[in-house]
Amino acid sequence: MTNVLIEDLKWRGLIYQQTDEQGIEDLLNKEQVTLYCGADPTADSLHIGHLLPFLTLRRFQEHGHRPIVLIGGGTGMIGDPSGKSEERVLQTEEQVDKNIEGISKQMHNIFEFGTDHGAVLVNNRDWLGQISLISFLRDYGKHVGVNYMLGKDSIQSRLEHGISYTEFTYTILQAIDFGHLNRELNCKIQVGGSDQWGNITSGIELMRRMYGQTDAYGLTIPLVTKSDGKKFGKSESGAVWLDAEKTSPYEFYQFWINQSDEDVIKFLKYFTFLGKEEIDRLEQSKNEAPHLREAQKTLAEEVTKFIHGEDALNDAIRISQALFSGDLKSLSAKELKDGFKDVPQVTLSNDTTNIVEVLIETGISPSKRQAREDVNNGAIYINGERQQDVNYALAPEDKIDGEFTIIRRGKKKYFMVNYQ
């Protein structure tokens, strides 16, 4: 019998590799399955590049299975070589603990806790930290062949430039994790990104060697790619974080709404919980009326609401509409800073107040003649209000919070003027 969840994952394009396709399907049809996905606390927030494996784990929870969310307080002290061309910088224990705290809060936004199939949050330092060096070498290292490890892509790719013994042992530590969760919490499936295949299969192999035949499986999801070849998960400002202090909900919303027609349907399948019928309808809308950008708006709304909540989504939409219409007066200083984070930043002396001189000194207009023309022609806006008086002097109330002024030239060229 085909499993409904597996069918949905296949339709969404979320299955990259499985250790035993039929075995996983039979298991899901037979029982409520406990499965896990992990992340090392390399920062105090996840970014959207981390999101897909955990959203996939959440889909299992939606179908009645129990997710374990593992935060690598132990492995995070070591560093995963997978997908990295050079050695990671080791973090202090204090920094790792701070990162764990931040990521744990975000997991409570992604998963349901406290139900009969509620998520379980674990930290692998709790068991890895109890293993002595002698025990590590005798009880675990004895079962892992060096040739086997050298065959792993994550190791092979680093051999030419060098890899420390610290990172070389990482895959064994992750293998121990899967074995521990399998024995202690009856965890039978590990979910991860495609770069985790080697670590996942190492865990299954270690269990087989230590315990004999073991009911354990692995499933990986594809690397998220964009049609233009650019790296997914980056905006002009850098990584798109789940932490609202690092990436505001407005910036988060804008990232999703700006996805291309070529990518938006794939991302609706990947990152939202909308069903096939609704996504098919949005695909039809994209094909027949692409100018409406209904698919992009839906993607932005669904993901922003899921991560940040309905109030934050409404604020993001309000800011977007105000910036689009030029109604800047309705926004707070923080909202304006968020909204204009990526526009050119120019610095102005507090002594310069005449509008023409302001335009010249900041380089907004290329010459005095052009500056006067811009003002006379109604092309200059101060904080959203048109200014056509060439003798106008910037007043204290034009300085938002006494810090900056937003000047627009023409229809779309915005500048943030900061004072010194």
Swiss-Prot record:
Q: Find motif ('KMSKS' region) and give its ranges.
A: 231-235
The compartments listed are: Cytoplasm
Keyword list (alphabetical) reads: Aminoacyl-tRNA synthetase, ATP-binding, Cytoplasm, Ligase, Nucleotide-binding, Protein biosynthesis, RNA-binding
Give the residues the record marks as binding ATP. K234
Q: Offer an example of a GO molecular function term for this protein.
A: RNA binding
What Pfam family is a match for this entry? SYY_C-terminal
Q: Which residues form the S4 RNA-binding domain?
A: 353-420
Annotated InterPro entries: aa-tRNA-synth_I_CS, aa-tRNA-synth_Ic, Rossmann-like_a/b/a_fold, S4_RNA-bd, S4_RNA-bd_sf, SYY-like_C, Tyr-tRNA-ligase, Tyr-tRNA-ligase_bac-type
Which GO biological-process labels does this protein carry? Answer: tyrosyl-tRNA aminoacylation
What's the Enzyme Commission number for this chain?
Answer: 6.1.1.1
What does UniProt give as GO cellular component?
A: cytosol
Reactions catalysed, semicolon-separated, are: tRNA(Tyr) + L-tyrosine + ATP = L-tyrosyl-tRNA(Tyr) + AMP + diphosphate + H(+)
Question: Motif range for 'HIGH' region?
Answer: 41-50
Annotated L-tyrosine binding lies at Y36, Y170, Q174
* Major subcellular location class: cytoplasm
Family note: Belongs to the class-I aminoacyl-tRNA synthetase family. TyrS type 1 subfamily.
Summarizing the function annotation, the protein's role is: Catalyzes the attachment of tyrosine to tRNA(Tyr) in a two-step reaction: tyrosine is first activated by ATP to form Tyr-AMP and then transferred to the acceptor end of tRNA(Tyr).
Q: How does it assemble?
A: Homodimer.
**Protein name, entry field:** Tyrosine--tRNA ligase
